[in-house]
Amino acid sequence: MKKYVLTLLCPLWLVAQAQKPVATPEKPNVIIVIADDLGYGDLSCYGEKTIHTPAVDALAKQGLRFTNAHTTAATCTPSRYSLLTGLYNWRRNDTGITDGDAAMVIRPEQTTIADLFKTAGYTTGAIGKWHLGLGAEKGGQDWNGFITPGASDIGFDYSYLMAATADRVPCVWIENQRVANYDPSAPISVSYRAP
């Protein structure tokens, strides 16, 4: 009788095991921090004794740190372009430091690191100084409406950006390709050309 019960229970147990959901490993969060005018020697997690950087140190302790990193350029637009596209900035003539009314340097048809992360199932975002241009042509942005192409056209699900730098107009924040807190009674007009 025991043999009969075991013969009956074993297949039932195997079927029950096959029905259990398989746990999928959780993907790690990936945060890339780009800081202008900051060398690795400026951070206390890399040995700096004078400047204390506890927030960055906490991130470094919990995550991955670069110990042998290189850049294609020592300035903003070119290094951002190369990081996001994986391409050398000096192979294009429009990847120098951009004005606030520059056309977007990264073309929507180019593959970016954001595209690769999205393909891998990540939600992507870009926050902070953009300095890669926005819109299709220099000076052609509609600062009072939807600005395209922009970050969503090159793989980012969410963006909250400053177009260039705090010393280059327009000095506004742009959320998902629209000026944040836009006031229609005070339209924005930007020109880098002499009147």
Segments predicted by a language model, with ranges:
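Formylglycine-dependent sulfatase
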Residues: 19-195
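Bacterial Sec-dependent N-terminal signal peptides
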Residues: 1-25
